[in-house]
């Protein structure tokens, strides 16, 4: 299937991105075949990301009644894959949280992604050039949250910075239960980011993400920022011949 075909078009906005250094060994069982864990200056990162999904359209044109605007919170890490002379830098999702069952079901069926649906809330507030964004979800009877506050104006990440590394991975990879790997392209312009002056993440990480992650969030994130976001296109997936 050609990557030129768009499966889903939307806007991703107000992306809270909290980034934690981890031992790459904890990611081993999540790494899809044909990919390898990516690193930045010798360190491996996982990211907790909360954001708004807005104006969602199937095939780039078909509006989805009652499902066009919603929030998502995910835990992801970064991989790379060689395609000929090209190195494709991508994202693997450990878990993705959305508020509607239909969205989770479509994503699981089409991409094999690890979606769950639970009640969610958000607070977005702007003050001057700054921004505060918080995303909350209810899991097993308790509310959890990811939050960041920024007081400065957003700027494009510096070339070669960690912020650029985190935001500019334009491929997604999923390991299917049958051992195959799914690859898909995500298209968007570079995002401006606010550097966070404060951040907060609360979750039962071991239960939600797996025992590998229960100790990953005891320390503050290595970096925290809010990405402005943009229009995005998620292209049809393909199964890799490995």
Task: Show the residue positions of the predicted features.
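Internal, well-folded beta-alpha domain core
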Residues: 74-242
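Extended, compositionally biased
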Residues: 44-98
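Hydrophobic, proline/glycine-rich low-complexity stretches
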Residues: 1-59, 194, 202, 206-242
């Amino acid at each position: 299937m050609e990557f030129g075909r768009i499966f889903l078009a939307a806007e991703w906005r107000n992306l809270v991105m909290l980034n934690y250094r981890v031992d790459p060994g904890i990611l081993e069982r999540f790494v899809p075949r044909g990919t390898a864990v990516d690193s930045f200056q010798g360190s491996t990162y996982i990211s907790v990301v909360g954001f708004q999904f807005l104006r969602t359209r199937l095939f780039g044109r078909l509006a989805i009644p009652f499902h066009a605007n919603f929030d998502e919170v995910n835990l992801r890490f970064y991989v790379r894959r060689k395609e000929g002379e090209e190195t494709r830098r991508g994202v693997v999702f450990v878990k993705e949280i959305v508020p509607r069952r239909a969205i989770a079901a479509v994503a699981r069926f089409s991409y094999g992604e690890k979606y769950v649906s639970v009640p969610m809330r958000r607070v977005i507030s702007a003050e001057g050039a700054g921004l505060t964004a918080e995303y909350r979800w209810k899991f097993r009877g308790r509310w959890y949250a990811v939050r960041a506050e920024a007081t400065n104006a957003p700027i494009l990440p510096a070339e070669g910075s960690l912020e650029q590394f985190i935001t500019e991975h334009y491929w997604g990879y999923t390991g299917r239960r049958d051992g195959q790997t799914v690859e898909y392209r995500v298209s968007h312009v570079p995002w401006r980011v606010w550097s966070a002056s404060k951040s907060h993440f609360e979750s039962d990480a071991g239960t939600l993400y797996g025992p590998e992650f229960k100790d990953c969030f005891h320390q503050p994130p290595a970096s925290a920022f809010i990405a402005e976001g943009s229009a995005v296109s998620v292209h049809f997936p393909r199964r890799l011949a490995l």
